[in-house]
Amino acid sequence: MGNLFEQVIGHKAVTAVLSRDVPEPAQAYLLVGPHGVGKATVARLFAVGILCGEDPQCGRRVLRGLHPDVVLIEPDGRSAITVEQARNTVALANLAPVEGERKIFILEEGGAMNDEAANALLKTLEEPTASTIFLVIAESEDDLPETVASRCRTVVFGRVSETDIAAGLIQLGVGEERAEQAARISGGRPGLAISLATRADVAAFRNVWMSVPLRLSEHAGDGYRLADEVAAAADPLMAALKERQESE
């Protein structure tokens, strides 16, 4: 499928390693880094490479969550991945793939596993079937029990430079000024930068935030009003962040 990770902003070292692994992937990976840096996006693309080769229709189904051999596991409104979800995952892992030679499980909030869930998964991670691959996503290795983390190949995602984020946004069709502003506010997180640059409600926060230095004065009342305005504008930003995290 050409350059598998060409739409990923930053993370060149990470995507180079995973590209090399596509023909013979490890049984389990732990993708760690801050929310919004692109871990889940890269995980899905890695799944595309493993399952689909040069089949674009297969790739689209993976990215849309429609491929029967890619299973997404997430808290689903709960505070943690539960033992019931873990047991269901173990049961599915023991089944043969539906279409190809491999079945991929993406744990989108691996750090949200409780101890019971981790223990339920442990035997499958210790003795995986040849057809099963786990992609566990978390903010830090410390978010998972050591017994789980030690059985995964760890891939670390760092924050991306403002320059690389701005360049990536421009490549996606975002105007230069908007791209640079979004990159500056994003804190090195391309996923957040994309929301800041492309969603109208989130862009309103960007505009308010960028205007603050020009509107500050010595009057305390102005500061309070600005703080209220920034807080109000941040509501859609927080909603977008939550949505991004859930879709990542």
Report the location of each language-model feature.
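Charged, glycine-rich active-site and insertion segments that engage polyanionic ligands
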Residues: 1-49, 53-62, 130-132, 139-248
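Conserved alpha-helical scaffold flanking the Walker A/P-loop in AAA+ ATPase domains
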Residues: 16-21, 83-104, 112, 123
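Residues at the beta-strand->loop junction immediately N-terminal to the Walker
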Residues: 32, 107-108
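AAA+/P-loop NTPase substrate/partner-engagement loops
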Residues: 56-81, 142-144
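Flexible beta-alpha connector loops of hexameric P-loop NTPases
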Residues: 76-83, 110, 154
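Conserved D-loop-proximal element of ABC-family nucleotide-binding domains
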Residues: 83, 114-116, 146
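Conserved catalytic/switch belt of AAA+ P-loop NTPases
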Residues: 94, 119-136
